[in-house]
């Protein structure tokens, strides 16, 4: 891994509502350690010297963003989010193109509700992929025994976990290649769950970079409680 890391753009799709949290606001605006989850997710990028700029995709009627201190940071640009994650990311990429970003610029897409990204993992991703022809993503090898089930919840088989990884973020790809993959997949009405799946559909093979397992995405209330306890123990 090189000591000289590449410059990059960051994209944070933050237009979702996080219904599984059953909270009074989108999960990215819930509190964690005195700040919102979204502020923590943005912070690792804003503190990085390689950041060229950051685009956050937000719901049109988002009432929470303007109250955040980072909403006035000149390095952050806001765009309208889409109905799905892929649309939100595509809107951000179109905005970067309009601002003069080049097709071969690196773009890192990170979940708005993944607040515990470490600087070491970010630097590892940048260093390992800076010369990669495709790009890739942080990921973690599956640890638990995995079962494939039928529609009734009955086990069909045990899956070989040595071949299974959990996809995390950031996911790092060239701006032009990711833009084409997302745009074409939307036209083809292909189900895209993350940026890597769009690149896979386009015929590419993203590289997995092993990261920390505590870079978890807040999806359920117990995820947030786990992070709160962990952060409290750091004090």
From Swiss-Prot:
Protein name: 2-C-methyl-D-erythritol 4-phosphate cytidylyltransferase
The family this protein is said to belong to: Belongs to the IspD/TarI cytidylyltransferase family. IspD subfamily.
Gene transcribed to yield this protein: ispD
One Pfam short name: IspD
EC top class, as a word: transferase
BP terms from Gene Ontology: isopentenyl diphosphate biosynthetic process, methylerythritol 4-phosphate pathway
Transmembrane helix recorded as keyword: no
Listed GO MF terms: 2-C-methyl-D-erythritol 4-phosphate cytidylyltransferase activity
Keywords: Isoprene biosynthesis, Nucleotidyltransferase, Transferase
Pathway: Isoprenoid biosynthesis; isopentenyl diphosphate biosynthesis via DXP pathway; isopentenyl diphosphate from 1-deoxy-D-xylulose 5-phosphate: step 2/6
CDD domains the UniProt entry points to: CDP-ME_synthetase
Cross-referenced Gene3D superfamilies: Spore Coat Polysaccharide Biosynthesis Protein SpsA, Chain A
Swiss-Prot/TrEMBL site (Transition state stabilizer) positions: 20, 27
């Amino acid at each position: 891994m090189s000591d000289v890391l590449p410059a990059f753009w960051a994209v944070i799709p933050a237009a979702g509502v996080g219904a599984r949290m059953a909270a009074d606001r989108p999960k990215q605006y819930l509190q964690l350690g005195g700040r919102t989850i979204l502020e923590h997710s943005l912070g690792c990028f804003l503190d990085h010297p390689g950041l060229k700029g950051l685009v956050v995709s937000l719901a049109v009627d988002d009432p929470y963003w303007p109250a955040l201190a980072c909403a006035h940071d000149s390095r952050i640009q806001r765009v309208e989010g889409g109905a799905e994650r892929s649309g939100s990311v595509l809107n951000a990429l179109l905005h970067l193109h309009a601002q003069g970003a080049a097709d071969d610029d690196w773009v890192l897409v990170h979940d708005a509700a993944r607040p515990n990204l470490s600087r070491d993992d970010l630097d590892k991703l940048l260093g390992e992929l800076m010369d990669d022809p495709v790009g890739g993503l942080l990921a973690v090898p599956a640890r638990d025994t995995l079962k494939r089930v039928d529609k009734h919840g009955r086990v069909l088989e045990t899956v070989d976990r040595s071949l299974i990884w959990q996809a995390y973020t950031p996911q790092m790809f060239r701006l032009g290649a990711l833009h084409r993959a997302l745009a074409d997949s939307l036209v083809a009405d292909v189900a895209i769950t993350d940026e890597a799946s769009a690149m896979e559909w386009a015929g590419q093979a993203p590289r997995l970079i092993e990261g920390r397992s505590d870079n978890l995405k807040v999806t359920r209330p117990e995820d947030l409680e786990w992070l709160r306890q962990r952060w409290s123990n750091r004090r």
